[in-house]
Amino acid sequence: NNAGWTHRNRPMLEVSEEEFDKVYAINMKSIYLSAIHAVPALRQAGGGSIINIASTAGLRPRPGLTWYNGSKGAVIITSKSMAAELGPDNIRVNCINPVFNPDTGLAAEFAGGPVDETRRAKFLATIPLGRFSTALDVANAALYLASDEAAFVSGVCIEVDGARCV
């Protein structure tokens, strides 16, 4: 489940109820709807793997994205809860927590405006490996979690973050 949305980076009390509802409808309800439709098929198949995309924001929140941060924290704990409940059905559930990627369509919302050099430098200074995540970084983590090599990996979140959450 790679559905995701955020409100513009700004003080929490300036986010409208409509924006709040959209963040939770996309970030959390998408997991519910995916599970409702996928779990019966995975049970019938004898098991499988569900991967939810959360965010480092659910572990190490930044100011200005309070409601987004909370929604991604909910994705993390929901993924762990699903792993515990669906394990007896041989269904593994994991999540991936990518760090900010300035090349996504939501980058300006996360940054609170255009991602100029000043904003890029501010974000980059918090990532010890010295670069942003890429779609390929996230895809590689998903490939591992979906593979037979991860057959005994369930209920974990992989931070694809260049050590930001350390």
What are these regions (language model features)?
Residues 35, 71, 79:
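Active-site helix of classical SDR
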Residues 6-9, 60, 142-143, 154-166:
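Short C-terminal tail/terminal secondary-structure segment
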Residues 40, 84-88, 151:
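Alpha-helical segment proximal to the catalytic Tyr-Lys
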